[in-house]
A protein has these predicted regions:
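Active-site beta-loop-alpha junctions of metal-dependent nucleic acid enzymes
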Residues: 1-2
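Conserved polymerase palm-domain catalytic core
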Residues: 5-104, 108-126, 137-143
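Short, low-complexity, polar/charged sequence segments that are solvent-exposed and flexible
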Residues: 41-45, 128-130, 155-156, 171-173
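Short polybasic/polar patches that bind polyanions
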Residues: 93, 130, 150
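Short, well-ordered loop/turn and helix-capping segments at boundaries between secondary-structure elements
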Residues: 113, 130, 157-161
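Right-hand nucleic-acid polymerase module
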Residues: 118-119, 136-238
Length: 238
């Protein structure tokens, strides 16, 4: 949904303006820097049940350091989204930004003025610093959208989207690892199929037909090699 929204906004702004620029940013070490006091104030503004607040307080402050929430905790996803909802409201309602998309700790803003985006960036940085006690990653950039916008593993243009090169390399590395483990008999086929289905599901939303076919061909090769090995074992050839 996030990538679709970026595509929608890119098409909309392209029709509206001759030149479009993108502010792309993400929060530095987000989960590790969520402030417990700020998080609890946000919960207290939305939840009135004292028992629920007590439990949330215990969970959030479980490490005792005052900042950071455990990534694997069931409540962490909710807490992380709720925390940056404060940023969403600030950007949309206080700054009146129309073309804004956030997914977890990554966000983009589209505008036809670089100067306006730099000014918005300064406002966002100040809000994050003083209200949420966060800061942006140094990778923050403002650039023309004709370069394509990297978001959620895709590089997105108004007309199409591609898988990022990093995403493709990661998938290929994982497939090589699975191949070795499967042929060695240390990994079951169901796990590989689940992973492959997830990758293909992600890739199909980009212009990746050839890449997906290559993945399926590679998977078929792995199965054939493993089956031949099993036949040899059964025949006493190994």
């Amino acid at each position: 949904a996030g990538a679709d929204r970026v595509t929608h906004f890119l098409r909309k702004t392209k029709r509206k303006w001759d030149k479009v620029y993108c502010l792309k940013a993400d929060i530095s070490k987000y989960f590790f820097n969520i402030d417990h006091d700020v998080m609890m104030r946000i919960y207290e503004s939305k939840i009135k049940c004292k028992d629920t607040l007590w439990l949330l307080d215990k969970i959030i402050r479980s490490d005792g350091d005052g900042i950071g929430i455990p990534i694997g905790n069931l409540t962490s996803q909710l807490s992380a989204n709720l925390y940056l909802n404060e940023l969403d409201q600030f950007v949309k309602h206080r700054l009146r930004v129309k073309y804004y998309v956030r997914y977890m700790d990554d966000f983009i803003i589209l505008h036809n003025s670089k100067e306006c985006l730099w000014n918005l960036l300064a406002e966002v940085e100040e809000f994050l610093k003083y209200k949420l006690r966060l800061k942006l990653n140094r990778k923050t950039d403002i650039f023309p959208v004709k370069r394509g916008v990297d978001f959620l593993g895709y590089r997105i243009w108004p007309t199409h989207r591609l898988l990022r090169k990093k995403s493709k390399k990661k998938i290929k590395r994982r497939m090589r690892k699975y191949e070795k483990e499967y042929i060695a008999g240390t990994l079951d086929i169901e796990k590989i199929q689940r992973s492959l289905a997830g990758w293909l599901g992600h890739a199909k939303f980009a212009n990746t037909y050839n890449f997906r076919m290559d993945l399926l061909d590679k998977w078929q090769e792995i199965i054939e090699v493993a089956e031949k090995r099993e036949d040899l074992v059964n025949m006493g050839g190994i």
